[in-house]
């Protein structure tokens, strides 16, 4: 884990400038979540509108919305693909994203252009540097 001030950055993940992370699993699917920075900036989460299983998304498309006490924020797809699973525990317990944003993923995607799109994402070290610049 890399620490940048009060924020934690988990190594082995890919990150976007919008503070989503992507984890490539051994079977080639991708888990998507939000970073520690994102959950701290949002504050206490009240609701996660999960995407529909079967939804096709392109990199940068809105994957879902998260409501906090401060605002409603959009979560963008870090890679293109089909939503094949969602973390249903978040429907009843959105605060799981506050408690551990790296263990509590939002959706699992079957990617369609993974190799190319991973090149456009940041590794943990690059994301930590990005956070230092904010």
UniProtKB/Swiss-Prot annotation:
Entry's cofactor comment: Binds 1 lipoyl cofactor covalently.
Pfam families the record matches: GCV_H (PF01597)
Gene3D superfamilies recorded: 2.40.50.100
Needed cofactors: (R)-lipoate
PROSITE patterns reported for this sequence: BIOTINYL_LIPOYL (PS50968), LIPOYL (PS00189)
Key words, A-Z: Lipoyl
Entries under CDD domains matching the protein: GCS_H (cd06848)
Modification sites for N6-lipoyllysine: 70
Top-level lineage group: Archaea
InterPro entries for the chain: 2-oxoA_DH_lipoyl-BS (IPR003016), Biotin_lipoyl (IPR000089), GCV_H (IPR002930), GCV_H/Fam206 (IPR033753), GCV_H_sub (IPR017453), Single_hybrid_motif (IPR011053)
Keyword set includes Acetylation: no
GO CC terms: glycine cleavage complex
Occurrences of domain Lipoyl-binding (ranges): 29-110
GO annotation, biological process: glycine decarboxylation via glycine cleavage system
Annotated family: Belongs to the GcvH family.
Self-association state and partner proteins as the record states: The glycine cleavage system is composed of four proteins: P, T, L and H.
Function description: The glycine cleavage system catalyzes the degradation of glycine. The H protein shuttles the methylamine group of glycine from the P protein to the T protein.
Designated name of the protein: Probable glycine cleavage system H protein
Organism whose genome encodes this protein: Thermococcus kodakarensis (strain ATCC BAA-918 / JCM 12380 / KOD1) (Pyrococcus kodakaraensis (strain KOD1))
């Amino acid at each position: 884990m890399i620490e940048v001030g009060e924020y934690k950055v988990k190594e082995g993940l890919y990150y976007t400038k919008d503070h989503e992370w992507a984890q490539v699993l051994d079977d080639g699917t991708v888990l998507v979540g939000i970073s520690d920075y994102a959950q701290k900036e949002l504050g206490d989460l009240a609701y996660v509108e999960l995407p529909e299983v079967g939804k096709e998304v392109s990199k940068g498309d809105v994957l879902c919305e998260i409501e906090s006490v401060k605002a409603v924020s959009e979560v963008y797809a870090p890679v293109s693909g089909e939503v094949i699973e969602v973390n249903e525990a978040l429907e009843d317990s959105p605060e799981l994203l506050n408690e551990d944003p790296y263990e509590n993923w939002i959706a699992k995607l079957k990617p369609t252009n993974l190799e190319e799109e991973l090149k456009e994402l940041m590794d943990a070290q690059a994301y930590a540097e990005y956070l230092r610049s904010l």
